[in-house]
């Protein structure tokens, strides 16, 4: 299953998945697609995600994933029917 990781809004310094978690997800059968610069504010770079098996892409591609994970609830206008969203909805 494809799992999308979104870049958080301005002011958020966390990222939903750090690069070292990717190998375990891959072994569990997930293909992880990370929005470019998603981890930058948490000091995780695109190259780290790629080195650990993720595909780094643009937001348009990431939100096509059937499973989305983020800290904040994404803009619902970007989502489609049947998607599963895992987030911390404050």
Q: What is the role of each PLM region?
A:
Residues 2-90:
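An N-terminal-biased, well-structured beta-alpha scaffold segment characteristic
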């Amino acid at each position: 299953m494809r799992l999308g990781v979104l870049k958080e809004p301005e002011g958020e310094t966390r990222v939903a998945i750090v690069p070292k978690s990717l190998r375990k997800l891959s072994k569990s059968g997930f293909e992880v697609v990370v929005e470019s610069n998603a981890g930058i504010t948490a000091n995780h770079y695109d190259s780290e995600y790629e080195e650990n098996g993720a595909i780094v892409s643009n937001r348009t591609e990431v939100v096509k994933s059937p499973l989305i994970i983020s800290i904040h609830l994404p803009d619902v206008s970007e989502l489609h029917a049947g998607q599963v969203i895992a987030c911390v909805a404050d």
